[in-house]
Curated annotation (Swiss-Prot):
Organism taxonomic ancestry: Eukaryota, Metazoa, Chordata, Craniata, Vertebrata
Gene: IMPA1
Subunit structure: Homodimer.
Function in brief: Phosphatase involved in the dephosphorylation of myo-inositol monophosphate to generate myo-inositol. Is also able to dephosphorylate scyllo-inositol-phosphate, myo-inositol 1,4-diphosphate, scyllo-inositol-1,3-diphosphate and scyllo-inositol-1,4-diphosphate. Also dephosphorylates in vitro other sugar-phosphates including D-galactose-1-phosphate, glucose-1-phosphate, glucose-6-phosphate, fructose-1-phosphate, beta-glycerophosphate and 2'-AMP.
Organism: Sus scrofa (Pig)
Record-level Gene Ontology MF annotations: fructose-1-phosphatase activity; glucose-1-phosphatase activity; glucose-6-phosphatase activity; glycerol-2-phosphatase activity; inositol monophosphate 1-phosphatase activity; inositol monophosphate 3-phosphatase activity; inositol monophosphate 4-phosphatase activity; inositol monophosphate phosphatase activity
Entry's transmembrane regions: none
InterPro entries tied to this protein: IMPase, Inositol_monoP_metal-BS, Inositol_monoPase_Li-sen, Inositol_monophosphatase-like, Inositol_monophosphatase_CS
Main location (coarse class): cytoplasm
Protein name as annotated: Inositol monophosphatase 1
Binding site for substrate: 70, 92-95, 194-196, 213, 220
């Protein structure tokens, strides 16, 4: 049977490359930077331009499909996940990196049907690396098959996370104390490149053993989530329970045992879900 979504995925790859060109071009020019929810939650005219290009191009080709986009939500649209084929888009994952010219910026496109991830495309713009994952077909970076690490021992693990954009003292305190508890297990280390999508792709590629974060959104995870699972990894809630795309929290791990061990150390930050008003 023909794969009904392969054409959509091929189109997503083409669009992600086009978006990457816009991002690289914009880096040469003066930026117009705006602030969203906190002084560290930034958006630029390029975020908005890229999202507009992606959504209008997809709408033209697939008018019956639904969309959740980071900048559309910031502008007041709702994040409602239905059973309809839905494109979940982060036009620039790593906007703060983009603003500073720090070389990790990604375009993330996730495609969800019946609330399940069908494919994901994450394009690392400055590195010119294309990560893809297709349900039942594996995960790849520029055509090379990805496989998570075999690491089950937390004391030999390298984790990836982010400090997030909240600057509320209590939230910052919890984030830092979670890192402290994990480091003192002890583990090999904690890294982070400033984009959840690429951090998750590093788990898929086997160069990091697990990623965890609270406070991120469905558009940060929808592209890379299926890349992790198709590379043999697991997604779970930060509590160790089942993963929920709209919950704003995730552990992406090379295996279940490692993910559950990390979950034991983490204090939860209470967050409003993406699908709550």
């Amino acid at each position: 049977m023909a794969d009904p979504w392969q054409e959509c995925m091929d189109y997503a790859v083409t669009l992600a490359r086009q978006a990457g060109e816009i991002v690289r071009e914009a880096l040469k020019n003066e930026m117009n930077i705006m602030i969203k929810s906190s002084p560290a939650d930034l958006v630029t005219a390029t975020d908005e331009k890229v999202e507009k290009m992606l959504i209008s191009s997809i709408k033209e080709k697939y008018p019956s499909h639904s969309f959740i986009g980071e900048e559309s939500v910031a502008a007041g649209e709702k994040s409602v996940l239905t059973d309809n084929p839905t494109w979940i888009i982060d036009p620039i994952d790593g906007t703060t990196n983009f603003v500073h010219g720090f070389p990790f910026v990604a375009v993330s496109i996730g495609f969800v049907v019946n609330k399940g991830m069908e494919f994901g495309v994450v394009y690392s713009c400055m590195e010119d690396k294309m990560y893809t994952g297709r349900k039942g077909r594996g995960a790849f970076c520029d055509g090379q098959k990805l496989q998570v690490s075999p690491q089950k021992d937390v004391t030999n693990s390298l984790l990836v996370t982010e400090l997030g954009s909240s600057r509320t003292p209590e939230t910052v305190r919890i984030i830092l104390s979670n890192m402290e508890r994990l480091l003192c297990i002890p583990i090999h280390g904690i890294r982070g490149v400033g984009t959840a999508a690429l951090n998750m792709c590093f788990v898929a590629a086997g160069v990091a053993d697990a990623f965890y974060e609270m406070g991120i959104h469905c558009w940060d995870m929808a592209g890379a989530g299926i890349i992790v699972t198709e590379a043999g990894g697991v997604l779970m809630d930060i509590t160790g329970g089942p993963f929920d795309l709209m919950s704003r929290r995730v552990i992406a791990s090379s295996n279940k045992a490692l993910g559950e061990r990390i979950a034991k150390e983490i204090q939860i930050i209470p967050l409003q879900r993406d699908d709550e008003d």
